[in-house]
Curated annotation (Swiss-Prot):
One of its GO terms (cellular component) is cytosolic large ribosomal subunit. This is Large ribosomal subunit protein uL14. Keywords: Ribonucleoprotein, Ribosomal protein, RNA-binding, rRNA-binding. Binds to 23S rRNA. Forms part of two intersubunit bridges in the 70S ribosome. It comes from Thermotoga neapolitana (strain ATCC 49049 / DSM 4359 / NBRC 107923 / NS-E). The keyword RNA-binding applies. Gene3D superfamilies: Ribosomal protein L14. Belongs to the universal ribosomal protein uL14 family. It comes from the Bacteria. GO terms for biological process: translation.
Length: 122
């Protein structure tokens, strides 16, 4: 359950380290985001001399949440942190590597490039 003002870790090598959610995209009444949702974020912490600077407004896709996700077979999955991957306007990742596991729900939402770069898919 990612909402406005939530801080997210960055799970790629784009240069950002921490993000703060400005808006969850997907409709006027969409309050919460979960795995696979696109959010608009502000970069709160970044690596020096990277393409992404502190204060930049970026789009990101949520790849891990601490709040459990119920799957259609009745199982639940949750992660140790809230994390996102920075994407461009074509929904392609801005970084070239993904760190940590990502949820299988990303494949169903069409983020195949992120799934293929991830070391583990849960």
């Amino acid at each position: 359950m990612i909402q406005q003002e939530t801080y997210l870790n960055v799970a790629d090598n784009s240069g950002a380290k921490k993000l703060r959610v400005i808006r969850v995209l997907g409709g006027f009444h969409k309050k919460y985001g979960t795995v696979g949702d696109i959010v608009v974020c502000s970069v709160r912490d970044a690596i020096p001399n990277s393409d992404v600077k502190k204060g930049d407004v970026v789009r990101a896709v949520i790849v891990r949440t601490k709040k459990e996700i119920r799957r259609s077979d009745g199982t639940y999955i949750r992660f140790d942190d809230n994390a996102a991957v920075l994407i461009d306007k074509f929904n392609a990742p801005r970084g070239t590597r993904i760190f940590g596991p990502v949820a299988r729900e990303l494949r169903e939402k069409g983020f195949m490039k992120i799934v293929s770069l991830a070391p583990e898919v849960w």
